[in-house]
Amino acid sequence: MGCHEQRSSAPPRARAAASPAVAALTPPAGPRYPGGFSFMKTVQPVLDRHCISCHGLKAKPAAKLSLLGTQTKFRIDGYPNWPRDIHATVSYESLLHRPGLIRIAQRNRETASSKPDDYFARASKLAPFLLAGHCPSLLKDQAAFRCIVAWLDLNAQYNGDYSWNRDEDRKAHPKGEKALRAFLATRFSSDLAKQPFAALVNVGLPSESRALRAALALDAGGWGQLANPMPSRTVPEYQQLTALVDKAVAPTAQQDREGTCNQKRCTCGSCWVRQAEEFWRKRMRTLAAGAK
């Protein structure tokens, strides 16, 4: 039974063999990283490889749909009836707001009794559109297509965790970005070096950055999209590029602390609990010391 079905309609208990072989779980497609499924870490690399050449890098994106991973924010309906801004990427906003392209289950707006075709990949237009051959290179890349379907079936979520200081929110480091662009201009082309930062570096998962994957030969596990690609990950030149990509991403200013944002200007609304506790513990220690 699903969570929106009537309890009285539960089917009778079916008896089956007690000793079937337990099937091994198949890991999901895409890169491995700590935490839950992240749009920026799993889906954006697919878009960077197969989509942004038409939907982002041109002056006028095809179908007026930009799939660049440039950070942005947009207004959503909160809960309950509390409008707020969500931090995401241009690509996420474009896919989410194109009518009918993505079909998600929004809280308190689901159908009374959910059916398989109500939401997710089966109800969204995106998966059938890709299966029809819109992007042959993506359709040929089955792992990439499975990443898209997994994202749709996970209700098109953006962040991979509930941290207040997320990898997805990191920014470019000015000096690091300048050094990276200089390297790309010298090794590949000035045109590549001038592309938007988000088209070169994935701040959420730098190892999946287009600057790295496109520069690596296909037979070495890369995308082989640039002229004279690097032959392997072990050559000094590729290791230098990897270090430059890492340095082009600024670290988060703060780290979560005891489930709170720990930021100078609190955004979680709960830092006062920890701060009050620390204040009174210090006060009690002072009083205890004075009583001796």
State each model region's role:
Residues 1-292:
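Aromatic- and Gly/Pro-enriched helix-to-coil junctions and flexible linker segments
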